[in-house]
Amino acid sequence: MDTLDGTAFRPRRAKTRMRKTLLALCAVSTLLTGCAGNPDNTNGTLTGEGATSQQNAINLFADVLIREHGLNLAYNATGSGAGVQKFLESVVVFGGSDSPLDADEAKRSLDRCKGHPAWHLPLVISPVAIAYNLPGVDGLVLTADALAKVFKGDITKWNDARIKKLNPGKTLPDEHINVIFRSDKSGTTDNVQKFLAYTAPKVWKADAVGKVWQG
């Protein structure tokens, strides 16, 4: 697969029981989204919901808050889409997301925050990876173009000539590629699709992005 500067690298092989699968995994800069005006609650418990990638960091923050300020922090790691939705519905004080609010969400946040804009606070930097599970094949190489064609359904088998050309000397099976992706709204999905749109624009169109999978 290509990096953003155009160089190639290898997807990570996923060591699971699932066979012959390709998974889209991504988390770049995860964010906390909250109101810029007066907080909903300055005593007792701060509630948040969202990206699982932030869970460990928020656990550390929670330890500091209770120790230094006597304030509890409760975070429900259900995914970026759910976190943003619960924030906009005023169910939680802040939402965690792997991608910022889109234009519609930002507009809705003005009502949520009583006329104030929502703040995006960069919180965690996490790696981006494409994982695959193909027993007996290590060090698989894919370009961004080939990867986009897999996710679009233009390449459907592991021994497709375009994949074989990128992996000389490797024995690739005549098996269908099963693409696995998030079914819910996900900031991870948004980041993967933005990567594909940037690195393989002839295959993955610029408008095929967002928290819902477009492949």
Enumerate the predicted regions with their spans.
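N-terminal export and membrane-targeting signals
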Residues: 2-27
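Alpha-helix boundary/capping residues
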Residues: 25, 29, 91, 154, ...
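N-terminal segment of the mature folded domain
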Residues: 38-164
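Flexible glycine/proline-enriched surface loops and loop-helix/loop-strand junctions
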Residues: 133-135, 170-179, 209-215
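Extracytoplasmic/periplasmic solute-binding protein
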Residues: 160-192
